[in-house]
Amino acid sequence: MSLPGRRASSLPSLCFCVLVLAWAVACQQEVPAGSPSPPPEPASSPWGLVRSKVKEFLEPLVTKTRERWQWFWDPGAFQGFVQTYYDDHLRGLGPRARAWLHSSKDSLLSKAYNLCPQLLCGDRDQG
């Protein structure tokens, strides 16, 4: 199967995205307990098969990932991560940004002055 304007190498990514989208739609269609349930979709229908296969494949993966990252969502661990990130990257950002802007402005003005003919800009030492 060839899609117009697409390379064959993008086809697996497209198929994966379609499968994930189908799984997400199928999961959203599940109704909460207590409400009347729609008639079950026959497993032999094409979308029923896709839904069951995708769910069968992704459910263990999602569960395993959720269990592995549970420590990260603990308030203490998350707060520690944010504090460390702030200490490493954001502390003193204001003064560093001002210094960078000042040096960039000076550098840009110097380059512009060097490009300007002396007749128009005058002597650099005077201004």
Curated annotation (Swiss-Prot):
Belongs to the apolipoprotein C4 family. GO terms for biological process: lipid transport; positive regulation of triglyceride storage; triglyceride homeostasis. This is Apolipoprotein C-IV. It holds the Pfam family APOC4. Its main location: secreted. Residues 1-27 form the signal peptide. May participate in lipoprotein metabolism. Keywords: Lipid transport, Secreted, Signal, Transport. InterPro entries: APOC4 (IPR028120). GO terms for cellular component: high-density lipoprotein particle; very-low-density lipoprotein particle. PANTHER family: APOLIPOPROTEIN C-IV. It is found in: Secreted.
